[in-house]
Every structure is written in structure tokens, then in C-alpha cells.
From Swiss-Prot:
Name assigned to this protein: Ribulose-phosphate 3-epimerase
Extent of the signal sequence: none
Pfam families in the cross-refs: Ribul_P_3_epim
Described function: Catalyzes the reversible epimerization of D-ribulose 5-phosphate to D-xylulose 5-phosphate.
Highest taxon in the source lineage: Bacteria
List of residues binding substrate: 16, 74, 150-153, 185-187, 207-208
Biological source species: Chlamydia trachomatis serovar D (strain ATCC VR-885 / DSM 19411 / UW-3/Cx)
GO CC annotation terms, alphabetical: cytosol
UniProtKB keywords: Carbohydrate metabolism, Isomerase, Metal-binding
EC annotation from Swiss-Prot or TrEMBL: 5.1.3.1
Organism placement in taxonomy: Bacteria, Pseudomonadati, Chlamydiota, Chlamydiia, Chlamydiales
Gene of this entry: rpe
InterPro entries given in the database record: Aldolase_TIM, Ribul_P_3_epim, Ribul_P_3_epim-like, RibuloseP-bd_barrel
First-tier enzyme category under EC: isomerase
PANTHER family hit by this protein: RIBULOSE-5-PHOSPHATE-3-EPIMERASE
């Protein structure tokens, strides 16, 4: 049922729970669901691959109990293989691992999929985008970091647009349109979202923009990120 949400036409919006009020994470998960967002992005950080430390399987399980939305774990950790089973048991519907985090990434992708969930690979901004080509036939999603991984509130890196275009073209050449999605994570707001959509992005991850307290409510922000310029009623 949750996987059907990934087949929806148009750009999917994935609020990152890292930007939420973590004192009431269950309520925030429900707020995301009520906003009309398509999935919840859960940033898992180990303090080694990136300097920040965030969530483990227990938090994923708590979010899973609070929502029916598709849950995506973005594993910014070394030795991701060791944690796959725990995150699957906690309720993850997709696990994304970093190209830079291990040498046996293709093995890890295969193992994630054998565990019955979707798999993806993330690429940091400084990593050559040409490495992506060999992963497109294997993955459900390619995630392009549009900031340096680790913290919310960073500015969108403009070079990401060319990287999206490269991946989009590679997906078309390899006949994987609709089977391998392009996800962009970092610095996403109304303006950068528009540029990403035009370049070919399928999923946009938003943290600071989505959760900041301002005059635009969450439902309106989802529509703006999707390209509905008039916002929600």
C-alpha cells in the first residue's frame, strides 16, 4: 500500500523529520501526513560519516506507529550493512545508503532489496556524478545531496541542477524511467524546488523550509514544492 504512493504522477514531497520538533515526533509525523506530503524522510547519522548524530531504529519504529506514510531512511553512516535488518524491522520502506560510506555498496543494495524494501544510493556534492551510471539499473532511487550532508539550514548548491540533468539523461538512456527515481536533498525551498523540477527531479526533501514557523502553512508548502503556485485552500 505504501509503495503505491511512490507511483503518483508529479513531484513527490518528502519532509525530513530532522527539521521537526523532536520533543513530539509522533505528532509531527501526523502533521506531515495531514499536510498532503507523500513520504517521510528520516536522516540517520552516526557522528562518524557525518559530524552530527540523529536517530536509530527506535525512532523509526516510533514514527512508523504514528503514520501510514511511506518511510525512507537516509543512512549517513559507515558500515550500513550492519543496520539494514534493524531498520527494516522498525518499519522502513526504503533505505538509502551513501556511495562514499562503504566499498561494497552494490552488495548492500542487493541485501536491502532481499529484505523486502526499496533501496537507493546517495551521492555527496563532491563525488563525481559519473559514478551514478552503474547504480541506475540496481536502485529504486538515486539521491543527490544538494548540500554537504550533516546539518539542516544550508544553502542549495547550484551545481546540483547539472547533476540532476545528467542522472535524468542516464535514466532515459538505460530505460529506467519510472523505475529509478531522482531525489534531491538539501536547501530545498520554493525557488530551488522549481529549478529541481525543471531539471527532472522526482522527489524533493525539505526540512527547514517545511517546518519553519511562518505565514505559509504545511499544506501550502507541499503544494508550492510540487509547483502549485497558488497554494492550498
Amino acid at each position: 500500500m505504501r509503495e503505491e504512493a511512490m507511483k503518483k504522477q508529479g513531484v513527490l514531497v518528502a519532509p525530513s523529520i530532522m527539521g521537526a520538533d523532536l520533543a513530539c515526533i509522533g505528532r509531527e509525523a501526523r502533521n506531515i501526513e495531514e499536510s498532503g506530503a507523500d513520504l517521510i524522510h528520516i536522516d540517520v547519522m552516526d557522528g562518524h560519516f557525518v559530524p552530527n548524530i540523529t536517530f536509530g531504529p527506535g525512532v523509526v519504529a516510533a514514527i512508523n506507529r504514528s503514520t501510514e506514510l511511506f518511510l525512507e531512511v537516509h543512512a549517513m553512516i559507515y558500515t550500513p550493512f550492519e543496520f539494514v535488518e534493524a531498520f527494516v524491522k522498525a518499519g522502513a520502506d526504503r533505505i538509502i545508503v551513501h556511495f562514499e560510506a562503504a566499498e561494497n555498496i552494490k552488495e548492500i543494495i542487493s541485501y536491502i532489496q532481499k529484505c523486502g524494501v526499496q533501496a537507493g544510493v546517495a551521492f555527496s556534492p563532491e563525488t563525481s556524478i559519473e559514478f551514478v551510471t552503474s547504480f541506475i539499473p540496481l536502485c529504486d532511487v538515486i539521491l543527490l545531496m544538494s548540500v554537504h550532508p550533516g546539518f539542516c539550514g544550508q544553502k542549495f548548491i547550484p551545481d546540483t541542477i547539472e547533476r540532476i540533468q545528467f542522472v535524468k539523461q542516464a535514466i532515459q538512456v538505460l530505460g529506467r524511467e519510472g523505475s529509478c527515481l531522482i531525489e534531491v536533498d538539501g536547501g530545498i525551498d520554493k525557488e530551488s524546488a522549481r529549478a529541481c523540477r525543471e531539471a527532472g527531479a522526482d522527489i524533493l526533501v525539505a526540512a527547514s523550509y517545511f517546518f519553519e514557523k511562518d505565514s505559509i502553512n504545511m499544506k501550502e508548502k507541499v503544494l508550492l514544492l510540487q509547483g502549485e503556485e497558488h497554494g492550498a485552500k
